Amino acid sequence: MCTMPATRDASGSGDASTDLIAARSLSSHQGQRSNLRIFKLLISCCLLMLCIYPNAWPWSIGPGSGPFSVSADSIKGRGDTHRLGEMGTSLSSSLPSSWLTQSNNHANISELLDNLLRGYDNSIRPDFGGPPATIEVDIMVRSMGPISEVDMTYSMDCYFRQSWVDKRLAFEGAQDTLALSVSMLARIWKPDTYFYNGKQSYLHTITTPNKFVRIYQNGRVLYSSRLTIKAGCPMNLADFPMDIQKCPLKFGSFGYTTSDVIYRWNKERPPVAIAEDMKLSQFDLVDCPAGNLTDIVYKAAAPRPQRRPFNNKDPPRPTSKVMTTFAGPAAKNQHVRGTGLKLDKGAFGTGRDATGGSGSTTGLSGTITLETNHPSEYSMLMVNFHLQRHMGNFLIQVYGPCCLLVVLSWVSFWLNREATADRVSLGITTVLTMTFLGLEARTDLPKVSYPTALDFFVFLSFGFIFATILQFAVVHYYTKYGSGECYFIIEELDSESGESETEPLTSDFRGSTESKIYEVIPLSMCAISMPPPPTRLGMLTSRNRRPRNRRHGLWSMKLLGLFDWRRRRKPPRADSDEDEDDEQTQLRANEAPTTSAAAAAAQAAAQAARISPPTGGRRRMSYYRREEMEARRKGKRTPQYNSVSKIDRASRIVFPLLFILINVFYWYGYLSRSSRILANTPDAST
């Protein structure tokens, strides 16, 4: 009973040991298989590297030769070396040839750039210690604007290309050029180009920095970038808006002198190219000449305080010694870089003080000595953009309205000289409108100290309008009667007049206690038309009229005769000594029967003869005096009126002719001047 379990245990332990041995053999066999797989993977990687870089391996794969020949024992009977070579050959043949060639080119370029930049110092210019490096520049202008007269600036978008030769970057290979990325740009030398008159210029960085570098086999480097340049443009607005502005662009090296770097325009391409689709809203780009300049800079030494003599109480006069000789016509921009000093050309080469040698100067604490033995010269390039302004906008907004206002002011010459209110209001309205128009025209201009061509035209128009008001003042000064109304003289009636005659006068004419009264009646009421010839019924009716109505009818006829004399200018009547009363004559004419045409004609002739004044001076005066005396005696109203002013008649011709003549001289002078400027456009270096 007790041994059986022991026997079973022994047999059980024997089975366990057998299983353990089998498990160990299985695990070792699996380990060998995994090692074999790893070894195969390494061999495959080596073959792949050999296919990718065949030139880097001096040996080739062949059956039973080469470093990749493996013995049969090492691969546990899985094949021989000939089979391994066939596997490598099949892998290399399965890859595309174009991909392999491109991979080889990339590898060659990377290796070439590494070799070129190995030991390259980008802080040293090309040919250091030898001749100066030549920088060739050309510009491609894509767009221009805005151009501001107030700030005197202009902006443009351009491709700024620079080219120079750096022999350290020369190479040999199948490719003629190498295009470098932006990251490689920081590893090579570049000129420190800056814009002399630049303001807020920047490089475009969307979507990536817009610049690239290209290297040629001979070591030439082409560096191109897209810039938006905002530069200053000193404008002369004397001919505005018929002006031609010259906006310069100056650039050069900031730190390298002419002994290190020289700037030149590219001879293979035009210095400044303009895009064909470029348009400006207010200007036309007529020309863009380019030239070379040399910027001569004089370095200023530090101020040295002067010692005061012990026995001299007066402080010494501070001086500034200037001894300089110009070196050719190219040396035009002479200044002290980094300071506010302005060199006096009159003191150059004379050895005298820059202050003129007389008088004392306050505000200087010492002397400033200019080191003129070795002035620094900087190479500089400049291009002038000649911009001709469009005049269409100003013709519509300024010139046209000014001319219309001047013509409108001439309407007062055709108004009556008595229409004071109308002529004055018209003149003041045109003056105020002209003032507003002149102020509005200068809103887009800087506050310059000199008048422009537009200001001259505005002043001219304002002067003509103001002269119109002065002309009316002179006309009004010589106006004898009225200021828009018709005046009549009324006197008290004689005491001998009857009540029937005084009653209508006092009721109609608003009599007063004064001996003479001036009553004002509008001109519209002074226009009285000729009544038709009286009929038989009318004559019968007129007999029954009251004396007041008859008197009003006689007054109307008399007033009509005075106005018709001015209009028709009929000859005077032959009998100037006729003293018959108008009322009696009219009554007789009304009472006489008009049965025949001869009687009617005789009556009309007599009436015309009575109302026509004489033309002679003496007869005219006697006629006026007689009419006035008759009016005073009978209480009638005598109208007083003025003739058309001779000044108005002359102004209708003189003012338009003078305005046209001045305009001809104005436009001819300014337009011909602009044409001469275009014809005699100087070079950019002047």
From Swiss-Prot:
Annotated glycan sites: 108, 292
Signal sequence range: 1-58
Annotated disulfide bonds: 233-247
Side Extracellular, residues: 97-393
Entry's transmembrane regions: 394-414, 424-441, 456-476, 651-671
Keyword 4Fe-4S: no
Residues covered by region (Disordered): 570-641
Residue spans of biased composition, Polar residues class: 586-596
UniProt KW keywords: Cell membrane, Chloride, Chloride channel, Disulfide bond, Glycoprotein, Ion channel, Ion transport, Ligand-gated ion channel, Membrane, Postsynaptic cell membrane, Receptor, Signal, Synapse, Transmembrane, Transmembrane helix, Transport
A cellular component annotation (GO) from this entry: postsynaptic membrane
Topology of the protein relative to the lipid bilayer: Multi-pass membrane protein
BP term (GO), one: regulation of circadian rhythm
Family: Belongs to the ligand-gated ion channel (TC 1.A.9) family. Gamma-aminobutyric acid receptor (TC 1.A.9.5) subfamily.
Listed name of the protein: Gamma-aminobutyric acid receptor alpha-like
Organism: Drosophila melanogaster (Fruit fly)
